[in-house]
Amino acid sequence: MADGHRYMQQSFSTPLPTQFASNNNLATGLLLNSLLNQFIADPSAAQQQAAAQANPAHSSATQINRGMYGQNHPQGHNPRLNGAAPGRQPNMPMFYNHVPQQGHPHQGHNAHHQVLQAGHSGHGARNDLMSHSTFSSGIMGNASPYTTNNLQNGHSVAARGGPAEQPANEHWQKQMRLKEESDRAHSAMTEQHQPHYYARLKAPENKGIGGSLTAGGANASGDSEEEVRRRPYQVEKRNRRQDWHNLDMSGQGLRALSSALFSYDFLVELYIASNRLTFLPAEIGKLRHLKILEASNNLLSELPPEIGMCTSLEKLLLFDNQIRDLPYELGSLYKLDILGIEGNPINPGLREEIVERGTKSLINSLLEQAPVPLPPSPRKPIVVQEDVSPSLERIKVMTWNILCDKFATTNMYGYTPTGALSWEYRKERILQEIRDRDVDMLCLQEIATDVFRDFFSPELAQNDYKGVHWPRPKAKTMNEKDAAAVDGCAIFYKGSKWILLDKQLIDYANIAINRPDMKNQHDIFNRVMPKDNIGIICFFESRRTGARVIVANTHLAWEPTLADVKLVQTAILMENITKYAEKYVRWQPLKDKRGIQIPQSVSVESDIPKPEMPEPGPSQEYRSNTDIPLIVCGDYNSTQESSVYELLSMGRVTPEQSDFGGHQYGNFTRDGVAHPFSMRSAYVHLNGTPDELSFTNYVPGFQEVIDYIWYSTNTLEVVELLGPPDQNHLKRVPGFPNYHFPADHIQIMAEFVIKQRKGEKVKVIHGSGGGASGQQQQQQQLEGGQDFGSGSK
């Protein structure tokens, strides 16, 4: 039998194997039934079961007969021709390990099918795609009919996700379903010569006929509420440059991608499958909004590290390429739901991870196992003005949103390794950065009460710093433990150089609801009152020169939908700065600066020597509130196009300002908002230069300047600024924080000199009354230990 045909080829006189030939009536009935079944649908499962129970012998014979005539095997025939109902292909096994005898492709080996179907379950739903001619021809006569070396598509069984006997899990089933879709698209573009398969698939959607045909497409839900919680601007609105967001370049035979493609940074979906691409350019990292990248059926052997910049990716399909390894930067793709790698000679360890535990687990493994990257080049100081008189008073100021620990979650910052995101690591990096900068005035946002009290205050005291801190007002309604974790704002200052004269908390919501012109406005209660943002105002005097300066620090609302609230908060801040500046003009001079010393707790146990006290100078006199040097720092969550920036830089906002949005805020919306100070952002001096600061907040999807150091131009002059971060380093950094940048904001720093007032000499004020002892006691209350951990007097 091995050398001859098992069945008659020219006649139907013996249509069945010899074991059924004795029953001619049964054989004839079976043959007729088989022929008719080629033109009618199969009976339902219930009918088949009933027939089997009524006549077991007939059922068994029917199964054998159908196997003989190819009713239930995957040889490439259309299922309708084999008698199957449209869309129904039950129990369609695949012949991966079996090589049939030449010339007899229709023989069935059902026991073998079951094993192979389990080993390659992903193809089980599309058995009709298998090539009949390839499978049944070109086989040597002496080939073993049970070879297991290779599957029909050229892959070994071991390369298809493990032993064939083990059923695929849900992760791998999803992988194989997408692989089949990719195969179908590739077949249509190469065999049927129909390129742009995905554009054709989405044609109804593009015409507005139906919804998205592809899961996870442009119409898929965007970022979660938690992911955008602290993003100060709507990314989708800002980057809407076109009415289209998808591009299909598949099936074109492309060998390289033009660099012009990557200028379309608004793309959400990019299809470059079924080409001849051997690499992806590093510019792929510019497509920061990309959610789907289909690059299957190419000749890719590796992925560029810059692929990690595409943190919006949800689906990355790389089926049937030549990729052996994956870059660690792929771990930054924390939103990736599916990584299609089937058909690649991928590293066995990576393959096992994705097969057993899925894409999310593989991405997280790459993220956590990645080595710490090399540090960036240090940020350079940029001299703005040279030849500054050494006799002028200098003030170095830094502001920094340090990212409160309770906000640093893996959901929010999934692209950051847990080691770099932990507070224990970040707080040490922040502390070291503060010490290295050695500024006179330090303004911090998002600093919790316990962090201020238990960590920064005692640590920075060793470096001659004293501090003032207030938490958000909601801390008043909490128990002591919960209140300690509430973040707020802080101002640290060098105690050997500056004396704290006064400090004030600006509670925006409380002030707004108690204003006579606003307390009856519904918008105040509905929009402003729920936000518990604050500001701090401190009044200092220089020990050496007697110059006085006002330093304010604030953190405004973050929501992009609350532009009106941010404007109201800024207006309240400037209104109170104006009010307190008028009070500070009349502030009594200090009579005995020598008696106002740094508390002994600052330097008793420190290895750093106690700083020498300068020879004190007399307190200076100011005629108006605008004469006092003013510095206003903070995280404003507002860009240069905002009304907040307009108010601070121009000094006025009209009632017609669009950011008010039709809401009513008393005098602010009736008369407009104004302040008397001439103010400028310190970093304006770098605009238009190679060192221009392009961001202060750096996270995926948002890189903008929203932190500022404002100063009064009539009293202060910028002499030096801290330059931007290393741009080359950022080409592979999707967002902060990371091992080298411990917060999602960067620190900005400016050094000022206090201008000498024209035509006026420094006046020595000889105060009268109120002995020195009482004044010293007042200063000790302001600057003493009770300031550490509490902003209230």
Swiss-Prot record:
Cited function: Acts as a catalytic component of the CCR4-NOT core complex, which in the nucleus seems to be a general transcription factor, and in the cytoplasm the major mRNA deadenylase involved in mRNA turnover. Ccr4 has 3'-5' RNase activity with a strong preference for polyadenylated substrates and also low exonuclease activity towards single-stranded DNA.
Name the UniProt record assigns to this protein: CCR4-Not complex 3'-5'-exoribonuclease subunit Ccr4
This enzyme's EC code(s): 3.1.13.4
Catalysed reaction, written as an equation: Exonucleolytic cleavage of poly(A) to 5'-AMP
Keywords in alphabetical order: Cytoplasm, Exonuclease, Hydrolase, Leucine-rich repeat, Magnesium, Metal-binding, Nuclease, Nucleus, Repeat, RNA-binding, Transcription, Transcription regulation
LRR repeats mapped onto the chain: 241-264, 266-287, 289-310, 312-334, 335-354
GO cellular component: CCR4-NOT core complex; nucleus; P-body
Disulfide bond positions: none
Cofactor: Mg(2+)
